[in-house]
């Protein structure tokens, strides 16, 4: 990595462009770039074949940890810019990210990028229809990674898959779990063609989730907390499932519900 003058002003054109990229999803789509902060998230990026475009580092903050060796080796392959701590505080979406922010090239996320399953393996997918809160999607990706889910499929999304808050809340799960974006119609057609059992989470006309077989090829489908699932998913479902609500409130946060349902699938699939 070659030494260079350190950017000390947030009015620098490169810093302004970075902040615009952070704030505007339309610009991210146009440039096909997104932002990642921190060693852990960047290492996840690199390990999954993402390509760094530009790296902004703060020498005052950058920590000399052994885990940085792989990251530092990658820096000469892309444009590297040094910034002061005051500038870094402005461009960092969250604190404690160890002095590294990078712009990353986007990947394709269509259904045709779904990984092929080994013969005899029953895939487990989680599907989210019209998810709009990036924090919820990030939390679900984190749970999906922990539960060994084969893919998270976002149908008719209302949030950007590369929203900085999504990346932050997923703790890198957006990179470790195959994530697909498509329409509900495309997804339903794919599941029907592949023999994937569709389980929709809803309160009405449903069975308790732990009484439902999740050992077969399965997609657990969830809607928004406000409106639930659309009719096309209800009509396409092979079964409707619910989590018992024993208090006054009639629903859980969608990320909490997803974690409960996914770990029931894990439990069933790991029974002796």
Predicted regions and their residues:
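A glycine-rich helix N-cap at a beta->alpha junction
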Residues: 71-93
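Structured adenosyl-cofactor binding patch, chiefly the S-adenosyl-L-methionine
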Residues: 146-147, 161, 166-173, 231-272
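Glycine- and other small-residue-rich loops at beta-strand/loop junctions that grip anionic moieties
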Residues: 7, 34, 129-130, 155-156, ...
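Boundary-proximal intrinsically disordered activation/regulatory segments immediately upstream
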Residues: 1-65, 70, 158-159
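Amphipathic alpha-helical repeat scaffolds
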Residues: 38, 132-139, 253-257
């Amino acid at each position: 990595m070659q030494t260079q003058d350190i950017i000390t002003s947030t009015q620098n054109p490169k810093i302004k462009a970075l902040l615009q990229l952070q704030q505007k999803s339309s610009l991210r789509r146009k440039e096909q770039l997104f932002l990642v902060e921190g060693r852990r998230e960047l290492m996840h990026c690199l390990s999954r074949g993402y390509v760094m475009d530009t790296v902004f580092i703060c020498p005052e903050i950058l920590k000399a940890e052994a885990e940085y060796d792989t990251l530092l080796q990658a820096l000469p392959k892309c444009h590297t810019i040094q910034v002061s701590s005051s500038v870094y505080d402005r461009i960092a979406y969250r604190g404690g990210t160890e002095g590294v922010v990078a712009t990353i090239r986007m990947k394709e996320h269509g259904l045709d990028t779904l990984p092929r399953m080994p013969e005899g393996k029953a895939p487990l997918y989680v599907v989210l229809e019209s998810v709009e809160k990036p924090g919820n999607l990030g939390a679900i990706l984190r749970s999906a990674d922990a539960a060994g889910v084969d893919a998270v499929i976002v149908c008719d999304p209302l949030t950007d898959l590369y929203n900085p808050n999504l990346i932050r809340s997923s703790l890198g799960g957006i990179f470790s779990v195959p994530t697909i974006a498509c329409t509900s119609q495309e997804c339903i057609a794919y599941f029907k063609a592949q023999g994937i059992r569709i389980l929709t989470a809803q309160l009405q006309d449903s069975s308790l989730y732990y009484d439902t077989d999740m050992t077969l090829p399965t997609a657990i489908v969830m809607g928004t907390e406000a409106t639930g699932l659309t009719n096309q998913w209800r009509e396409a479902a092979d079964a409707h499932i619910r989590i018992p609500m024993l208090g006054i409130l009639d629903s859980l946060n969608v990320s909490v519900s997803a974690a409960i349902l996914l770990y029931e699938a894990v439990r069933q699939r790991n029974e002796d």
